[in-house]
Design a protein with these regions (language model features):
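Donor-binding/catalytic cores of nucleotide-activated saccharide
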Residues: 1-93, 100-116
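Membrane-interface aromatic/basic loop that binds lipid-linked glycans or pyrophosphate carriers
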Residues: 10-16, 130, 157-180
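A short alpha/beta connector and helix-capping loop motif
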Residues: 89-98, 121, 145-146
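A short glycine-/small-residue-rich loop at the edge of a beta-strand within enzyme catalytic domains
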Residues: 112-119, 140, 144
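C-terminal, non-catalytic tails of nucleotide-sugar-dependent glycosyltransferases
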Residues: 123-144
């Protein structure tokens, strides 16, 4: 896909899929790449989780009552959707051509400072951890989930530093949190 910044500049987003068709246990590996990256990988996640770049089977959505949650309920609702949907998908096909323009929105909930972001990140972490525990042993998903969570914690700290006059106190509290 193409990534369009707030100033209008366009760049091809780096996407690196191992293959164009995933089936069976390969779908689990694709999902784990959305959850987080392996320790040696340079980024926090290996595969973008955004649902806007996918097409989904309406019969699967209806048969399993899969719904897309609001970002106001959980952060990164895209991953929660994929956790549910990919458990029922028989195959995932990747189209290599960039067919979508994603326009960055600085006013979206993802980019705006929220005083409760860290609390919501922890709630999201616990929800994803509980969902993954139903499908995988902890040693399979925990390193990936923890690495991605720490990346999200870094974003919380950066937002505190940039937008909150009490940032040192809040950052210290984040760093002392047992989950971190």
């Amino acid at each position: 896909y193409y990534d369009v910044s707030a100033d209008g500049s366009v760049r091809l987003a780096p996407e690196d899929y191992a293959r164009s068709l995933y089936t069976g246990a390969e779908i689990d590996q694709l999902l784990l790449g959305m959850v987080g990256s392996r320790p040696h990988h340079p980024h926090d996640v290996e595969i973008g989780m955004s649902v806007w770049k996918g097409l989904y089977s309406l019969p699967i959505l209806r048969a399993h009552h899969i719904r897309f949650l609001s970002e106001r309920e959980y952060l990164s609702e895209d991953l929660l959707f994929h956790l549910d949907y990919l458990a029922h998908a028989g195959a995932v096909a990747i189209v290599p051509e960039p067919l979508y323009y994603y326009c960055q929105n600085p006013a979206s909930l993802t980019g705006v400072y929220r005083a409760d972001r860290f609390v919501r990140e922890k709630r999201f972490y616990e929800k994803v951890s509980a969902e993954l525990a139903l499908r995988f042993p902890p040693e399979v998903y925990r390193p990936r989930l923890d690495k991605a969570f720490l990346g999200r914690v870094r974003r919380c700290i950066a937002q505190e530093a940039a937008h909150n006059k009490n940032s040192l106190r809040n950052i210290a509290a984040i760093c002392r949190d047992p989950l971190v």
